Amino acid sequence: MGKMIIDLQIASADESGLPTAAQIEQWATAAVQPQSGEVEMTVRIVDETESHALNFNYRGKDHPTNVLSFPFECPDEVELPLLGDLVICRQVVEREAQEQEKPLIAHWAHMVVHGSLHLLGYDHIEDDEAEEMESLETQIMMGLGFVDPYLSEK
């Protein structure tokens, strides 16, 4: 099995209660399952102001969001092991965990897994795509020792 290299950037005013670099690496590795060599991605933990600005600029949505995924698009003739960037909003993740009555650490793990799958090209725009992605997320999360993240919706 290959190795995940995570460039963790903390751009949140409050760093307490955030997952560790080792946890984020474990969750991303479970989602990406690199086969050989090294695979790199950036995980940036931000506050609502930055999340809101990025969500507005790139998706036209006028509010912060839990996770944004920016896949690295490399020309075919160039081989670079870069997956892309995840931008995760601390306050949105904390609020959602509370609203959904989930352990905070489980929701952090889910956001890293969910975002990592987006970097691999998975999507949830169409119902069949959403079903496939949610099934894969559930499988990965349960493999990590967490409960089904969609349990409350079933």
UniProtKB/Swiss-Prot annotation:
InterPro entries: MetalPrtase_cat_dom_sf_prd (IPR023091), YbeY (IPR002036), YbeY_CS (IPR020549). One of its GO terms (biological process) is rRNA processing. It holds the Pfam family YbeY. Binds 1 zinc ion. Its main location: cytoplasm. Single strand-specific metallo-endoribonuclease involved in late-stage 70S ribosome quality control and in maturation of the 3' terminus of the 16S rRNA. This is Endoribonuclease YbeY. It comes from Aggregatibacter actinomycetemcomitans.
